[in-house]
């Protein structure tokens, strides 16, 4: 890839497949930002994934739980942990790769105006049958203690409203330009220029 910065919209991607792609790109030196992690898909029903996550919550260090397994609840941190598991994060190379990654719920201000990409090989529609049960990472996080889901949804609604007004304005400008170019006053000038090969 090797762009200055790659912004990936994680909506509709599968958790593990997207994490493996991101990990590989990070190791090659690419800087990556992943947005909308609350909309990542996990194969399997919400109930099944909650059972698996509750088993993970049971893991801790007996004599000092604060030093043991960190049980992240936010979707961004769950995805970060999945990527970390695919990197040699205890070596300098892996630690440097992990520092090149930024992950967010929703789309915060600097990245809402940046062109975003998708990873086609990691999309749910490419990899799973329609009949397969899936759940969203945001729903799983909210069911195990993440308390920011409603806030993120409100902020996303506001962002979508801003994006719609911006898009409508651009469409209106494009239509006005088309009308100007099709005006009869310009037709005579265009015909004159066409004689000279323009």
Curated annotation (Swiss-Prot):
Q: Which GO terms describe its cellular component?
A: cytosolic large ribosomal subunit
- SUPFAM superfamilies linked to this entry: Ribosomal protein L13
Q: Is Secreted found in the keyword set?
A: no
Q: Out of the domains of life, which is the source?
A: Eukaryota
Q: PROSITE patterns per the record?
A: RIBOSOMAL_L13
Task: Give yes or no: UniProt keyword Metal-binding.
Answer: no
Q: Which UniProt keywords apply?
A: Ribonucleoprotein, Ribosomal protein
GO MF terms here are: mRNA binding; structural constituent of ribosome
For this entry, list what GO says about its biological process: negative regulation of translation; translation
Family of the protein in this entry: Belongs to the universal ribosomal protein uL13 family.
Protein's UniProt name: Large ribosomal subunit protein uL13
> Could you tell me the gene encoding this protein?
RPL13A
């Amino acid at each position: 890839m090797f762009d200055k910065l790659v912004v990936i919209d994680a909506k509709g991607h599968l958790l593990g497949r997207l994490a493996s792609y991101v990990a590989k790109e990070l190791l090659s030196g690419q800087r990556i930002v992943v947005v909308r992690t609350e909309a990542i898909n996990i194969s399997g029903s919400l109930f099944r994934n909650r059972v698996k996550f509750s088993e993970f919550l049971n893991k801790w260090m007996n004599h000092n739980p604060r030093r043991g397994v960190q049980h992240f609840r936010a979707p961004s941190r769950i995805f970060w942990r999945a990527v970390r598991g695919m990197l040699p994060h205890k070596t300098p190379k892996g630690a440097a790769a992990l520092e090149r990654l930024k992950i967010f719920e929703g789309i915060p201000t600097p990245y809402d105006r940046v062109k975003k990409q998708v990873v086609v090989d990691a999309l749910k529609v490419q990899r799973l049958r329609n009949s397969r049960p899936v759940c969203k990472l945001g729903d799983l996080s909210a069911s195990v203690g993440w308390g920011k889901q409603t806030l993120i949804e409100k902020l996303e609604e506001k962002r979508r409203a801003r994006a719609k007004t911006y898009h409508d304005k651009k469409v209106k400008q494009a239509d006005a330009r088309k009308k100007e170019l099709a005006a009869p006053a310009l037709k005579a000038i265009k015909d004159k220029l066409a004689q000279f090969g323009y």
